[in-house]
Amino acid sequence: MDIETFLAGERAADGYRCGFVAIVGRPNVGKSTLMNHLIGQKISITSKKAQTTRNRVTGIYTDDTAQFVFVDTPGFQTDHRNALNDRLNQNVTEALGGVDVVVFVVEAMRFTDADRVVLKQLPKHTPVILVVNKIDKDKAKDRYALEAFVAQVRAEFEFAAAEAVSAKHGLRIANLLELIKPYLPESVPMYPEDMVTDKSARFLAMEIVREKLFRYLGEELPYAMNVEVEQFEEEDGLNRIYIAVLVDKESQKAILIGKGGERLKKISTEARLDMEKLFDTKVFLKVWVKVKSGWADDIRFLRELGL
């Protein structure tokens, strides 16, 4: 018997818990920021713009008593109907199918019809924990107003529990972990204790570039783009990464590149620095732009992209 098997058996005997936790909510309520704080490391991209998360991202947090496997989902889309958004909504539904706990995230003092649409998608026989995020905002600093808001949302659904947090500042994150833990099944850990994601380096590189696109472009343009890793080569002390950004029109390509190529250069430089920090190695990054008209409504092409 190897040491890992022995330790896993010891943990099971001590009531160790391990399970899957889906983080869901309408776009832009802070789901990705919340997951990054829960696992203690940035692996899911964040932006003030909606729909930055397109793929389900698995983050893992392990302590002495439990292992939490978090699934960060795209924000459920009720606007901008196209094949891409239909596929993103299907991703949310699929993510809910095999989890032990659902964390439903709403923005403090703001419960909308879009939140209600997400609530209707939640499973009836899986524990759902309400998380009220952004309690650092001025309107949420009144304790009595916040308590009234939580009561209002709890009246909409049979939640197993509720917690108010600030994902941005990491407030009450430890409390949330303790709230989730009893709903995880008793089990040995599924992943090594030092593992924080099951996603590949290629996937993480792609996500970093997408984050920079959302950060440095306008409100609409990033939604008409997709990022593809064309080549990823790992050498001794250097990762060579070649990434194509797919756009719908030549005019979008010009906007992305910017005057004299300055915008694309800035996006590429910041993405490279983030990759070097994440991968703990030097990175050579080449980013270029390709035009493919109508890609967001091409179902076959979306399947090829894994969406």
From Swiss-Prot:
Single GO cellular component term: plasma membrane
Main location: cytoplasm
Membrane topology, record value: Peripheral membrane protein
Keyword presence, Iron: no
GO molecular function: GTP binding; GTPase activity; ribosomal small subunit binding; small ribosomal subunit rRNA binding
Region (G4): 133-136
Domain Era-type G: 17-186
Record keywords: Cell inner membrane, Cell membrane, Cytoplasm, GTP-binding, Membrane, Nucleotide-binding, Ribosome biogenesis, RNA-binding, rRNA-binding
Gene Ontology biological process terms in this record: ribosomal small subunit assembly
Compartment list: Cytoplasm; Cell inner membrane
Summary of the function given for this chain in its UniProt record: An essential GTPase that binds both GDP and GTP, with rapid nucleotide exchange. Plays a role in 16S rRNA processing and 30S ribosomal subunit biogenesis and possibly also in cell cycle regulation and energy metabolism.
Assembly: Monomer.
Protein name per Swiss-Prot or TrEMBL: GTPase Era
Organism of provenance: Neisseria meningitidis serogroup A / serotype 4A (strain DSM 15465 / Z2491)
Gene: era
